[in-house]
Amino acid sequence: MVDQNAAILVVDDVAENRDLLARRLRRLGLSRIDEAANGHEALAAIAKTPYDLVLLDIMMPELDGFGVLEALRADGRLNDLPVIVVSALNELDPVVRCIELGADDFIFKPFNPTLLRARVLATLEKKVLRDRTRDELKRKQAELNEARTLQLALVPPPFAGEAVGRQIAVAALLEPAKEVGGDLVDYFFIGDDQIVLALGDVSDKGAGAALMMARTHALFRALAARPDAPELFADPARAVGLVNEALARGNASCMFVTFALVSVDLATGVLAYVRAGHVPPYLARTDGSVARLGGGGGPALGIVEGFAYRADRAELTPGDRLLIVTDGFTEAQDPAGTLYGEAPIGELLAAGSGGQACLRSMVEAVRAFEAGEPQSDDMAAILLTFDVI
């Protein structure tokens, strides 16, 4: 159904032609009709009024129809403004040129009233559908932007302070590849002497992955609120096993989550960790060496119901830094398709310091390596500096 309030601009240097077109349009029930005698008047009118359709003559003095189309195309107005060319030139070349410049349709003079009616109404109907589609896309984009804001709000702020007599620093980072992503980064204290680091990567991307990420995040946070949380996270295999059961049971989406969970006893420096299909964490020592924590392995969460995960252990000494990343860093690609790899991450960790600046430098290094290639995967990282020297 065509909007009877549609605004139409008739552009022709001959007054009789403008009058004839206007009368035909009014017979269709369209009453909001303006006229312009040349291209300059047309552009001035279009700048002031949001028209729904322009009927444009080609051959006009001062500024012809080609010039009008070129001007509208240059400032992007043709994306929202349909134009029907009304031409006295019974040749295809000028019409083809107009279509290439962005016109939606054409009618030859002298025009057939039935054909004029059909093309005007069809173009206006397409305009309505196009506007609805544009508005729906804007609404969805606004929702995605809001979801991105909410997801980034889940990333905990940096921490620097004292715990059981030690100076602890934690930095976390999340860079979704799309508006929302499937990477999870979190840390929390349990009691006065235990900190838990969590990093996950959902197998998919976009809104579905973000929902899976939010569910996983909520499950771990729920465990952290239990009265037995200190004992539960002292052996992170127990916590990982419980979350895996919840995700694997009835997993109709077949999504899974690679996950690294690390629990650190701040009094002793002993850490226990589980890697559920995740990239091994990096451990940078004060002597400049960087080790990989390759133990504590098992399948990603949500795949094998009832799997018995086992934790592995390591020990932190003053000044050590523990880094966990998702494969959005290591599997970034340059224009030739070469992977960034895991080694450069360790080199940057060894050369840098702790804190948010270190994580940002890693992101910048990956961006430089990609050399303009679009980010293909979410990037998340968490960095713990133990007993800052």
Predicted feature residues:
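Short amphipathic alpha-helix used as the core "switch/output" element in two-component signaling
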Residues: A44, F66-N79
